[in-house]
Amino acid sequence: MEAKAQTRYLRVTPQKARRVVDLVRGKQATEAVAVLSFAPQSAAEPVRKLVESAMANAKFHADKHSEAFDPAEYVVKAIHVDEGPTMKRFRPRAQGRAGRILKRTSHITVVVAPAVKGAKKTRRTR
């Protein structure tokens, strides 16, 4: 059973969040949490919490429908980052000018699902 979690208006630029999201796409959910726990990027912690939230949602749905729940069999089926609204600020510059500062936000969505039995893992070749 698929489970979904999303965070909105996260104060991390989408470009930096996508670097973190690419680390865990397609991995086992428990492995993804371990990778994100030690990733140095600032976006790693919110993404880790989001994956944990999706797993908690999966456990809730499994309990609700009286199904067995094994966290080891869940994988990050889909994860993507969308751009949220941008806050515009101004910084004073020389000779009365103003420089524009863009404070970007992100919307991140995670979908976890049980791994398909018998599916082979594909490796990308260079």
Curated annotation (Swiss-Prot):
Going by the UniProt record, its keywords in alphabetical order are:
Ribonucleoprotein, Ribosomal protein, RNA-binding, rRNA-binding
**GO MF annotations in UniProt:** rRNA binding; structural constituent of ribosome
Q: Name one Pfam family in it.
A: Ribosomal_L22
What InterPro entries is this protein classified in? Ribosomal_uL22 (IPR001063), Ribosomal_uL22_bac/chlpt-type (IPR005727), Ribosomal_uL22_bac/org-type (IPR047867), Ribosomal_uL22_CS (IPR018260), Ribosomal_uL22_sf (IPR036394)
Which GO cellular component terms are attached?
cytosolic large ribosomal subunit
Assembly, in brief, is: Part of the 50S ribosomal subunit.
According to its UniProt record, which protein family does this protein belong to? Belongs to the universal ribosomal protein uL22 family.
Quote the function comment for this protein.
Answer: This protein binds specifically to 23S rRNA; its binding is stimulated by other ribosomal proteins, e.g. L4, L17, and L20. It is important during the early stages of 50S assembly. It makes multiple contacts with different domains of the 23S rRNA in the assembled 50S subunit and ribosome. The globular domain of the protein is located near the polypeptide exit tunnel on the outside of the subunit, while an extended beta-hairpin is found that lines the wall of the exit tunnel in the center of the 70S ribosome.
What this protein is called in its record is: Large ribosomal subunit protein uL22
Q: Which organism is it from?
A: Kineococcus radiotolerans (strain ATCC BAA-149 / DSM 14245 / SRS30216)
Q: Gene that codes for this?
A: rplV
